[in-house]
A protein has these predicted regions:
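Noncatalytic, solvent-exposed loop/strand surfaces
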Residues: 1-182
Length: 182
């Protein structure tokens, strides 16, 4: 199968991924007018492009032309699809239907931050590592709620890595290995 982007996309960075039996594909280059997210059902054949006036079809569960980030890959955690935008906003929608729960909430109104690393989730929380090295912790769910901010003290642009029981966070000067107390 294949589909054609509704408009030309200049640069594609977010990684496609699967959850809830759907394949999620996003492309939101900062210079593009439209920033597409598609949730694709399995079993497709042929051309599954979205046509004018459509936001879904037989093989596209949902589509939004203004929902994609530039650098971070979106996250599905529980039943929610989270979009972390490079310029410091977080949005949440239903992962299966695309219905918006909250849109583009400013992560930190007092200290605007950029985001390159992709978000991750653990034990009911969504985490976002800013380029300034601050990790923002949100309560997972349909309502936007910032719980806390952790500081690493250095510029961070790399995606955190999960390995075994550890979370690895790299910044400009340090590599942090974090795990739960036993």
């Amino acid at each position: 199968w294949s589909f054609q982007w509704k408009t030309k996309t200049s640069i594609v960075i977010p990684t496609p991924f699967a959850a809830h039996g759907l394949l999620y594909v996003a492309s939101g280059y900062v210079g593009d007018r439209e920033k597409h997210v598609y949730a694709i059902r399995p079993g497709a054949k042929g051309d599954i492009s979205i046509h004018s006036g459509e936001d879904s079809n037989k093989f596209v569960a949902w589509y939004d032309k203004r929902a994609a980030p530039y650098n971070p890959t979106p996250l599905v955690y529980g039943d929610e699809f989270y979009t972390l935008y490079d310029f410091g906003f977080l949005a949440c929608r239903d992962a299966r239907t695309g219905k918006l729960h909250y849109g583009k909430e400013r992560i930190n109104p007092d200290k605007p931050a950029g985001f390159t690393a992709s978000p991750w989730a653990y034990r009911g929380h969504v985490f976002a590592l800013s380029e300034a090295g601050d990790t923002y912790v949100f309560k997972a769910g349909k309502k936007f709620k910032l719980v806390r901010v952790n500081h690493t003290g250095g510029m961070s642009m790399a995606n955190p890595a999960l390995t075994g029981d550890r979370l690895l966070i790299r910044n400009q000067t340090h590599l942090f290995s974090i795990r739960e107390k036993k």
